[in-house]
Amino acid sequence: MATGGGRAFAWQVFPPMPTCRVYGTVAFQDGHLLVLGGCGRAGLPLDTAETLDMASHTWVALAPLPTARAGAAAVVLGKQVLVVGGVDEGQSPVAAVEAFLADEGRWERRATLPQAAMGVATVERDGMVYALGGMGPDTAPQAQVRVYEPRRDCWLSLPSMPTPCYGASTFLHGNKIYVLGGRQGKLPVTAFEAFDLEARTWTRHPSLPSRRAFAGCAMAEGSVFSLGGLQQPGPHNFYSRPHFVNTVEMFDLEHGSWTKLPRSLRMRDKRADFVVGSLGDHVVAIGGLGNQPCPLGSVEGFGLARRRWEALPAMPTARCSCSSLQAGPRLFAIGGVAQGPSQAVEALCLRDGV
């Protein structure tokens, strides 16, 4: 493990993936890290599927995806991994839904999405898969909400989101799915909405205070954080084009309001397109793009108790556009872009947890 500042944290470096990729789909199942599809050096979606055995630290090639795709969503359902949507080799959104059967090492096709979509957000609850939003073949953002019933192998429609979007951040908290941000074409969305799984109704919460693309979002201790990103030009700032910011905005779920933290509590680095998550009592920001000519390797954490940012151990491999996944005490940064698509697989860990 690499060590440095932030004594509670360290990096665990795993063997590189056999295939370099960006926009890969990742899942963690029974001690195995699965990396599916994505884009390789040629810039085209892959059908390659690989898994890392966390015990032996060895990679194994899996049966290829029936549909080559990048930017798909994945949900673990027991011994299966369901892959939903994405973009295909023709740069068109995908309707295909496929399941990898881990015990049998093979893929099965499942009921397709009612409408092809990329940038779908997925959430699993009680064995059901909820797919929210996306962008269709006509490039219009979608408001559809669908739920997949594995036993019947079918998708059912639920009340649509108030705000169509794709690429949104989603969080499951209690009996509600929270949907934050996303995009409509090139424009970032500021909407923050919640779907009640029992009442099957939507609630609009106050919108994000600022409009930013490629921000990082996380939930920790009853609050939702929106960090950094590319600030969009607007009537209330003097920038004529998007610029990197270190903004920190926090929504208190109990009180139902946003707080834009003061300058003294902003992130140490301005960044966008980075990995974000919650480890222990810290909200963590990893890598990304900033004002430098190459991806950032810096890492920082916001201590929820001390309410301040501190430097954490830097990434062993500086990258942006990583696929990320949180599994127990590890926050993975997988693939992404260094000087091109990367093979790196690294995890920021809580020292006491590994």
From Swiss-Prot:
Kelch repeat residue numbers: 1-31, 32-79, 81-127, 128-175, 176-222, 224-281, 282-329, 331-354
BP GO terms, sorted: mitotic cytokinetic process; mitotic nuclear division; nuclear chromosome segregation
Keyword Cell division applies: yes
InterPro entries noted in UniProt: Kelch-typ_b-propeller, Kelch_1, Kelch_domain_containing_8
GO cellular component terms, A-Z: cellularization cleavage furrow; cytoplasm; intercellular bridge; midbody
Main location: cytoplasm
Subcellular location: Cytoplasm; Midbody
Superkingdom of origin: Eukaryota
This protein's record includes keyword Transcription regulation: no
Keywords (A to Z) from UniProt: Cell cycle, Cell division, Cytoplasm, Kelch repeat, Repeat
Function: Involved in pinching off the separated nuclei at the cleavage furrow and in cytokinesis. Required for mitotic integrity and maintenance of chromosomal stability. Protects cells against mitotic errors, centrosomal amplification, micronucleus formation and aneuploidy. Plays a key role of midbody function involving abscission of the daughter cells during cytokinesis and appropriate chromosomal and nuclear segregation into the daughter cells.
Protein's UniProt name: Kelch domain-containing protein 8B
Organism: Bos taurus
Lineage per the UniProt record: Eukaryota, Metazoa, Chordata, Craniata, Vertebrata
Gene: KLHDC8B
